[in-house]
Structure formats: structure tokens, C-alpha cells
Amino acid sequence: MKALVLPEPGKFEIREVPTPVPGPQEVLCRIRAVAICGSDPEIIRGGLAGTWPPSYPFIPGHEWAGEVVEAGEGVWDFKAGDRVAGQAHKGCGYCRNCLSGRYNLCENYGRPETGHRHYGFVSPGAYAQYNVYSIKSITPIPAGVSFREGALVDSAGVALHGLELSGVTTGGTVAVIGPGPIGLVTVKLAKTMGAARVIMVGRGARLKASKKFGADLLVDIEKEEPVESVRRYTDGLGVDEAFECSGAAGTFHQAVRMARKGGRVSLLGVPPGSLMEPLPFKYIVHNEIAIFGSRANPNVSGKVIHLLSSGQLKGKDLITHVFPLTEFDQALDTFVNRKDGAIKVLIEPNGPEES
């Protein structure tokens, strides 16, 4: 099979590699669509080498959808031909966090001998024609949800998990920092969950695109001071919830300052590993600002698929570009440099879905 392989940090190439064989409680899947995530360029560059990935050569990619080709031993609820969407995390299943449903925080992270998997980060990923997955990391998708839309389940789940952690005040005002794919979905779902107003903070074409997803007010960071503008839009009070979806320097501090007294801040964006910021501790304490770190998307894939199938979340609005695996270099360049209004850029390792 063909796969995108990282032979060493900073390099990638399309290679012929052996098709993997599913083990117990695993399925072999044909990858029909895989989306480029913001973490992928960093993994490819090698900025996290030694952790993501732990060694080379390595196949990245974790936001995918496809179909089951072969079921391993002990699999009875999936069969060849089933359409599925994947998520990156699969916990060991027996540590305290896994037993409480927080498998995204598995105590045995990075130890495959315990059963832990983090596909596309630590375990082989989806930039390939086929890959093997635990049945605990896949969710069925109905015929009404395309493979391309199914490849959005993982990233949309990140937004939903962050929203569920902090909650959304019915009739309240929300600020979202960062109009990338996760931020845009956060806008849409915040309105779905009852927010009366959503303020999007960002820049460029993606900021303008957030109107399509339900943003009521836009704050352009290239033209105005974000905290002052959000405060002005809320009569000086601040927002009920602020969602940081960019991971950029300075935005955590901004999110805290945007929150009203008793407000909540949810951190969805993944900052660079070296990023350190001074925090307004006195402000946080005196105003009882609740802060939530939000990692990945545990236990929400089924909900996201229902949102897609019902039309409440329109995946097609996020997908701007689609490339074959052989044009990954062009796809990556389009994504990283936001060319031609790029939002979500997809790869189809096995060609386009039949209409």
C-alpha cells in the first residue's frame, strides 16, 4: 500500500509499505479521507521528535474516515464494508482515568504494551491507504454522512469536548479566540447549545468566514485590541465563557481578561511546548474565573456524527480543498500558508468517494 512516511525529522515521502494486519479487537480500515490537523505540520517538522513521533520511520495523520476491510479476532460488532470515523485516542482501559471515561488522559500514555494507542502521534496513523485501529477508537457513520465529512469528526469533537467541559450559559455571550477549524465549529456549537451572542476574535479570511458559522460580532486583532473590544461589546462586563482555540502566544491571558466575574475559560488550542506566559493570578482569584484545560475529544464522536447527519453542523462549509495522497506536499503548503481561503484541507489516499 501507499503511505506518507516520515523517514526523519523534517522530511516526508510517499512509499510502498506492507499493509498492516489487524490483531484481536482490531479492524483493518481503508482510509477514504483524512484531514490535515494543525498538529501535523509540527509533527512533520520534527519539533516534537522523540515524543510525537517516538521514533522513525513514522506514518502520521489522525483525522480520518473510511470503511472496514477486515476484522480481527474477537470483533463481532464491525464487519467488512462498515463505514466508520476514527478518533486519535485509545486508552489502556484499566487505569483510573480510563475507568472513569477519561481515556484521553490515560495513565499509560505512550506504552503500547498496555494497549494504549495515540494514532498519528505515537502509533501509526492515517496518511495511508490502509491502517489498523482498535474497535474502541472508531464510530459508525451513516450513509448520509460522506467520508469527507466523517474526517471532521475528530476535530469537531475537540470543539464539543471543550464546550461540554465549561458549559455554555443559555442566553449568554461567548468569545472564541482563533477562527481555525476548531474555533469555527466552537462558534456553531456554542450557538446550538444556547449562547445568544458569539464574538469571534482573529484575523484574515477565516475571521470573515466565521459569520457563516454564526458569529455575531468580529474582533480583528490586526486592527483593534482584543480584550478592549470584547469588553466594549459586553458593556464592560466581559463574556460568560471564553474559548481559546489558537494556542498562540498571549491568547490565554486575553481569554482570562475577556471573562466576566464568575466567568469560565476553556483552553482548546495546543501551544508550542516552549511557550510560557505570565498569568493574571490576582484577577483570576478575585473574580473567581474557572479555567478548564481541554484535551482531545473523549466520548463525543457519536454526538458529532448526529450533528452532521442532522445538518446542524454542516461539514461541507469547513472543507475547502481536497488532494490525492501523491500531492501531499501541495496540500500541506495550502494548509500551512492558508492559500485560497484554506480552512480544512483533506487527503484522499484511495481516490474520491463514489457518488
Positions of the model-derived regions?
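Cysteine-cluster motifs in flexible loop/terminal segments that predominantly coordinate metals
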Residues: C37, Q87-I138
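Glycine-rich cofactor phosphate-binding loops and adjacent beta1-alpha1 units
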Residues: S166-V168, K208-I289, E353-S355
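C-terminal hydrophobic helical "lid"/dimerization subdomain
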Residues: M1-A3, H253-R257, P298-S355
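Rossmann-fold dehydrogenase core element
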Residues: G263-R264, P278-L318
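Glycine-rich beta-strand-centered segment in the early N-terminal region that forms part
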Residues: P18-V34, L48-L99, P142-G144
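Residue-level recognition of short, solvent-exposed, well-ordered loop/turn junctions
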Residues: G23, K79-A80, T169, R260, ...
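Mid-domain Rossmann-like dinucleotide-binding core that forms the NAD(H)/NADP(H) cofactor-binding site
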Residues: K136, P142-E224, E228
